[in-house]
Amino acid sequence: MSEIQSLTERALADVAAAQTPDQLEALRVALLGKSGSITAQLKQLGTLPADQRKAAGEAINLLRDALTAALAERKNTLETAALDARLAGERIDVTLPGRRSERGGLHPVTRTLERIVEIFARLGYELSDGPEIEDDWHNFEALNFPPHHPARAMHDTFYFGDGRLLRTHTSGVQVRYMDAHKPPLHMIAAGKVYRSDSDQTHSPMFHQLEGLLVDEHSTFADLKGTLSEFVRAFFERDFEMRFRPSYFPFVEPGAEVDIAWQQPDGSTRWLEVLGCGMVHPNVLRNVGIDPERYTGFAFGLGVERFAMLRYGVNDLRAFFENDVRFLRQFA
């Protein structure tokens, strides 16, 4: 019995000292396996005197049960410790600042265009769209451009080999709209246009918005009132405005609109912001509208021009350089 007691003490001490699951498994095999020391004790019960077998058997069974429980407890302890160590290594430091999501924003030209469209929508104008690759009829001929007009020259217009071209204005959308609708008409067209020009105030691609109204009793006074209301709504203040006579093939009379713009030094100067005029009778005839019954007015403006004025940008090219430092100001 003393041998069993000694074996119990050694075995429990070895179990408690095991540091890894592999060590613990090797110890289990050495104690409880087919060739283990506890199994050997059970096999020796037959050699004991009959009066000692029962007590020895009970002692060995108690030892086996104690070792089984100790092994299970130690295994659970080692597995828990291993899991804690792994979790500690993978732990997320909640005190570490998160990665900030970059906040996006609309491009200033897009902001400006949407603002202009919204203003004219409140005035009852319908937004229409058309192709950027146009034919000569919709871009020039239907709009009363004579064959010798400078705008048709290669240095002003991007032509394709088949005679088509990149539209130089959105006026072609007006022609298509008048072909598809009957008066009265109230529409605007906005989008990219292309001209062979590039400097501090010009870009080979820019955005334009044009408007058209055709009705039986439209006058230049209606045009003036419409544009005055638009300028006031866009800049959110009143301006002194003047309408200078000017020439555009598709309107007669035509005018350019200037506003009294305040300079940084406090002085004011006249600043051109858009062109306009009464729709030329030839344009109405080209789309099947009787100029004896209907009159109309049209206007056009450069969106980048208004964006430069609204946001105080001096160089048009800044809108197209994709400099994040510049664009972030509008996010």
From Swiss-Prot:
InterPro entries: aa-tRNA-synth_II, aa-tRNA-synth_II/BPL/LPL, Phe-tRNA_ligase_II_N, Phe_tRNA_ligase_alpha1_bac, Phenylalanyl-tRNA_Synthase, tRNA-bd_arm. Its cofactor is Mg(2+). GO terms for cellular component: cytoplasm. GO terms for molecular function: ATP binding; magnesium ion binding; phenylalanine-tRNA ligase activity; tRNA binding. The keyword Nucleotide-binding applies. It holds the Pfam family Phe_tRNA-synt_N. Its EC number is 6.1.1.20. It comes from the Bacteria. It is an enzyme of class 6 (ligase). PROSITE patterns: AA_TRNA_LIGASE_II (PS50862). CDD domains: PheRS_alpha_core. Tetramer of two alpha and two beta subunits. Belongs to the class-II aminoacyl-tRNA synthetase family. Phe-tRNA synthetase alpha subunit type 1 subfamily. PANTHER family: PHENYLALANINE--TRNA LIGASE, MITOCHONDRIAL, PHENYLALANYL-TRNA SYNTHETASE. This is Phenylalanine--tRNA ligase alpha subunit. It comes from Xanthomonas oryzae pv. oryzae (strain KACC10331 / KXO85). The gene is pheS.
